Swiss-Prot record:
Coiled coil: none annotated. This is 3-hydroxyacyl-[acyl-carrier-protein] dehydratase FabZ. The keyword Lyase applies. It comes from Bordetella pertussis (strain Tohama I / ATCC BAA-589 / NCTC 13251). Its main location: cytoplasm. Its EC number is 4.2.1.59.
């Protein structure tokens, strides 16, 4: 399954400047995703990180992996939504083994590959990788919590 920006925005609450997924190339609901983030010099974080040598902050690469994980975790086998996004919160609650191997700079296309290690109704664990031109630039294990906003 693929998603364009409209499909992504239908599923994620994030908006500019925090929406960090531009396209989904492959998605197996509940299992894995391959998504793209096109890195532009127009990103607001490049103003201060760093003006003389712009580098995408590693924490935002990890956030992009977390957003990708939300996309496939909340999509059912038929491409529909498993839950009402207006009534559900998805929090990044843990990051283990994060490694940043190469800088990500304007003009790069970040390929995000995330696989589920464990999914439950309240806690999910994932393995995420970010690549540029086929080279690993970052990786991390993520843990996310799912909470009802009605509680």
């Amino acid at each position: 399954m693929e998603l364009d920006i409209k499909g992504i925005m239908d599923r994620l609450p994030h908006r500019y400047p925090m929406l960090l997924i531009d396209r989904v190339l492959e998605m197996v609901p509940g299992k894995s995703i391959v998504a793209i983030k096109n890195v532009s010099i127009n990103e607001p974080f490049f103003t201060g990180h760093f003006p003389h040598h712009p580098v995408m902050p590693g924490v935002l690469i990890v956030e992009a992996m977390a957003q990708a994980s939300a996309l496939f975790s909340f999509t059912d086998e038929n491409g529909g939504l498993k839950c009402d996004g207006a009534k559900t919160a998805y929090y990044l609650v843990g990051i283990d083994g994060a490694r940043f191997r190469k800088p990500v700079v304007p003009g790069d296309q970040l390929r995000l590959e995330v696989e589920a290690e464990r999914l439950s109704r309240t806690i999910c664990k994932y393995q995420g990788r970010a690549l540029v031109d086929g080279q690993l630039v970052a990786e991390a294990k993520l843990m996310c919590a799912i909470r009802s906003l009605e509680e």
